[in-house]
Amino acid sequence: MSNKAPVEPIVLGKMGSCYGIRGWLRVFSSTEDAESIFDYQPWFIQKGGKWEEVELESWRRHNQDIVIKLKGVEDRDAANLLTNCEIVVDSSQLPKLDDGYYWKDLMGCQVVTTEGYELGKVIDMMETGSNDVLVIKANLKDAFGIKERLVPFLDGQVIKKVDLTTRTIEVDWDPGF
């Protein structure tokens, strides 16, 4: 493990509970295809506020889970120390998209209705069965007294325009909803 740090960190997954006694851990992947998490190396974790690079030794499927073995993690006690650590990579490793957006690109964007009402900023994204949903933290002086809005990311239908240079998303949405 080295102390390098990712320049633009992005979370791709999380280490779960131990598997067995030889230092294996379950992994929860946030990538669209769960096994794609292994396409992005090196991995970084944060321990005690410091970045550590971890090296993947091996991985395999076990029932519905994915389990991993990291170099230098030889027993259950060492693996236990990594439970719940987020798996982070440098976002520069992600492929450029011809069409569409990474969730990370939408975070912090100001959301405005087609009528010009400022709904707030994107603070999170949720995946539902049918479509993604923007989680928007409303401005402090929201006229409708709303603190948080959930707006479906339906391109063309609700989402009218995404401008990553100005960090704005224009939506056709009722601010009172």
Swiss-Prot record:
Localisation: Cytoplasm
Cellular component terms per the entry's GO annotation: cytoplasm; ribosome
Superkingdom of the organism of origin: Bacteria
GO biological process per UniProt: ribosomal small subunit biogenesis; rRNA processing
Keywords: Chaperone, Cytoplasm, Ribosome biogenesis, rRNA processing
The keyword Cytoplasm belongs to this UniProt entry's keyword annotation: yes
GO MF annotations, alphabetized: ribosome binding
Record has rRNA processing as a keyword: yes
Residue ranges annotated for the PRC barrel domain, each copy included: 98-177
Quaternary structure and interacting proteins, as annotated: Binds ribosomal protein uS19.
PANTHER family xrefs: RIBOSOME MATURATION FACTOR RIMM
Family: Belongs to the RimM family.
Job description of the protein: An accessory protein needed during the final step in the assembly of 30S ribosomal subunit, possibly for assembly of the head region. Essential for efficient processing of 16S rRNA. May be needed both before and after RbfA during the maturation of 16S rRNA. It has affinity for free ribosomal 30S subunits but not for 70S ribosomes.
NCBIfam families xrefs: 16S_RimM
Domain remark text: The PRC barrel domain binds ribosomal protein uS19.
Full protein name: Ribosome maturation factor RimM
Protein species of origin: Enterobacter sp. (strain 638)
Upper lineage: Bacteria, Pseudomonadati, Pseudomonadota, Gammaproteobacteria, Enterobacterales
Gene: rimM
